[in-house]
């Protein structure tokens, strides 16, 4: 709990409940594990920071930072000010990495990297001090807790994890408010588009937070599997990760009385796994049928059969490279290779002009 688990949420109450649950679990394991944890790294982003003009002097005083570096500091501070709205979608390390030279063969590249390391170290140190100062003003326990949360949050944004998991919010781009729309456009629109739904942004963010050999676990609506507007999301997954396991669960009351339409999956960033087959579990065919209530049972049986290397009619196995064989990369995993090859043939549109009418 103290050294391996980290978490971020906008909702302060959700964070408090999670902290309580972790302590209860720790109490249950105390007999086997020994000492109880004294704190957690599960934090809320419900803290506020002042306008940059009030802290600008602390950042640039005595520094020789150029205009680009100063703009980066300003941008990062403004993003942190919006943490209570955007949470872990804020990208600190990525903005700093953008200052590094693209061409590593450049004769000055190593010097630039050394200068950037010094800049990052100095900037982060000042940033931590300023965040702690402004969020921790006052001696009351709540202010001090918020100060610690803000520093932990900043550390989380700069850390690479072995595993990153999320059950992200589901908000269609048409329902983005003006602020969220601008934030997503600035951070998750180029070079690939992750702006179709808020959960798509979290797919990208979790992959960024996971280390080079890390894993990503997600659960969210399965709309991204086929729809054209999620093409870049699928392209990113197939290009940058390996699909270890993917469950197409479909509409169900997976979370009690709330009906959801989820897919859940595990991605691996380890390049050595990309040649391994991907495993898919298909359960959506039971949606709105008498067998719908058995989905959970079928899923658990399929997972067990995967572990024991037994046959299961719900499990499909294939190299994920085959998913690239159809235009826009839909996650169509259940068709035969022969049928898949037909998608590489000429389209009717390529041969004749299709017209309406007789």
Spans of features found by a protein language model:
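Signature of N6-adenine DNA methyltransferases within the class I
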Residues: 10, 15, 19-40, 44, ...
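Class I S-adenosyl-L-methionine-dependent methyltransferase module
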Residues: 1-154, 158-159
């Amino acid at each position: 709990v103290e050294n391996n688990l980290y978490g971020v949420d906008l909702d302060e109450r959700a964070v408090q409940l999670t902290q309580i649950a972790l302590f209860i679990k720790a109490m249950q394991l105390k007999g086997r594990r020994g000492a109880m944890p004294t704190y957690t790294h599960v934090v809320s982003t419900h803290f506020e920071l002042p306008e940059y003009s009030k802290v600008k002097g602390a950042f640039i005083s005595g520094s020789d930072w150029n205009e680009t570096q100063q703009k980066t500091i300003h941008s990062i501070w403004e993003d942190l000010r919006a943490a209570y709205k955007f949470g872990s979608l804020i990208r600190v390390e990525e903005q700093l990495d953008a200052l590094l030279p693209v061409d590593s063969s450049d004769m000055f590249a190593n010097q630039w990297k050394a200068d950037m390391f010094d800049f990052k170290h100095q900037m982060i140190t000042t940033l931590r001090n300023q965040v702690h100062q402004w969020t921790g003003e006052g001696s009351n326990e709540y202010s001090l807790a918020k100060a610690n949360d803000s520093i932990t949050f900043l550390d989380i944004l700069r850390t690479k994890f072995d595993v990153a998991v999320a059950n992200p919010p589901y908000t269609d781009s048409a329902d983005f408010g003006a602020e969220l729309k601008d934030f997503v456009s600035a951070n998750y629109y180029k070079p690939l588009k992750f702006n179709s739904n808020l959960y798509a942004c979290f797919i990208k963010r979790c992959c960024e937070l996971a280390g080079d050999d890390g894993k990503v676990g997600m659960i969210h609506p399965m709309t991204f599997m086929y729809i054209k507007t999620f093409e870049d999301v699928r392209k990113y997954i197939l290009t940058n990760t390996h699909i270890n396991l993917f469950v197409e669960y479909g509409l169900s009351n997976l979370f009690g009385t709330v009906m959801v339409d989820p897919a859940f999956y595990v991605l691996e960033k380890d390049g050595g796994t990309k040649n391994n087959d991907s495993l898919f579990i298909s359960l959506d065919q039971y949606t709105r049928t008498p067998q719908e209530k058995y989905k959970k049972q079928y899923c658990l049986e399929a997972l067990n059969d995967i572990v024991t290397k037994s046959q299961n009619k719900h499990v499909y196995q294939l190299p994920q490279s085959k998913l690239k064989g159809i235009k826009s990369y839909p996650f169509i995993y259940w068709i035969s290779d022969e049928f898949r090859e037909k998608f590489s043939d000429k389209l009717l549109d390529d041969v004749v002009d299709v017209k309406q009418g007789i």
